[in-house]
Amino acid sequence: MALIPMVVEQTSRGERSYDIYSRLLKERVIFLSGEVEDNMANLIVAQLLFLESENPEKDINLYINSPGGSVTAGMAIYDTMQFIKPDVRTLCVGQACSMGAFLLAGGAAGKRAALPHARVMIHQPLGGFRGQASDIQIHAQEILKIKQTLNERLAFHTGQPFEVIERDTDRDNFMSAEDAKNYGLIDSVLVKR
């Protein structure tokens, strides 16, 4: 298990300690780090909803460093980002690959960014299934529907034609922060605050 730093604050009522992520949550900063999976998605969704209830007018900052992961878990986060009232600013630190890149692009228009040496990668959804031929066919049809949806949403967020997205996600497509900006996945490359 990773060591999580603690922050100690002095108040008029004494000292109070927080883990670093809880302290940053008070500043409306959420970290999406590691593989996108159901437990992580539930935590991110809960934090988004909590921050909306605290102040529905103030932006939320979502920092992303992820190799990607589960499409359904990622879509839970994405749909919540689109559903809540506050704008969600996205910032790639390190990498945003696969579902991580999709969530990066899903931030509020004009408020999506990456640090200069971040890497972004888009591709088609991965899937695998074993079983009876008819069940394999059902799962193949489902993954094609998911691919269609992801490509439609990427086209919407990037401004790229659907056909371009379809071509560019056929295989792993790695981009620098500047390339991701030119492609429309992000709006800016941040060097300094």
Swiss-Prot record:
Reaction catalysed by this enzyme: Hydrolysis of proteins to small peptides in the presence of ATP and magnesium. alpha-casein is the usual test substrate. In the absence of ATP, only oligopeptides shorter than five residues are hydrolyzed (such as succinyl-Leu-Tyr-|-NHMec, and Leu-Tyr-Leu-|-Tyr-Trp, in which cleavage of the -Tyr-|-Leu- and -Tyr-|-Trp bonds also occurs)
Which InterPro entries does UniProt cross-reference here?
Answer: ClpP, ClpP/crotonase-like_dom_sf, ClpP/TepA, ClpP_His_AS, ClpP_Ser_AS
Report the SUPFAM superfamilies cross-referenced here. Answer: ClpP/crotonase
Localization annotation:
Cytoplasm
Q: What is its EC number?
A: 3.4.21.92
Q: What class of enzyme is it?
A: hydrolase
Q: Which GO terms describe its biological process?
A: protein quality control for misfolded or incompletely synthesized proteins
PANTHER family given in the database record: ATP-DEPENDENT CLP PROTEASE PROTEOLYTIC SUBUNIT
State whether it acts alone or in a complex, and with which partners, per the record.
Fourteen ClpP subunits assemble into 2 heptameric rings which stack back to back to give a disk-like structure with a central cavity, resembling the structure of eukaryotic proteasomes.
The molecule here is called: ATP-dependent Clp protease proteolytic subunit
Taxonomy-wise, where does this protein's organism fall, top ranks first?
Bacteria, Pseudomonadati, Pseudomonadota, Gammaproteobacteria, Pasteurellales
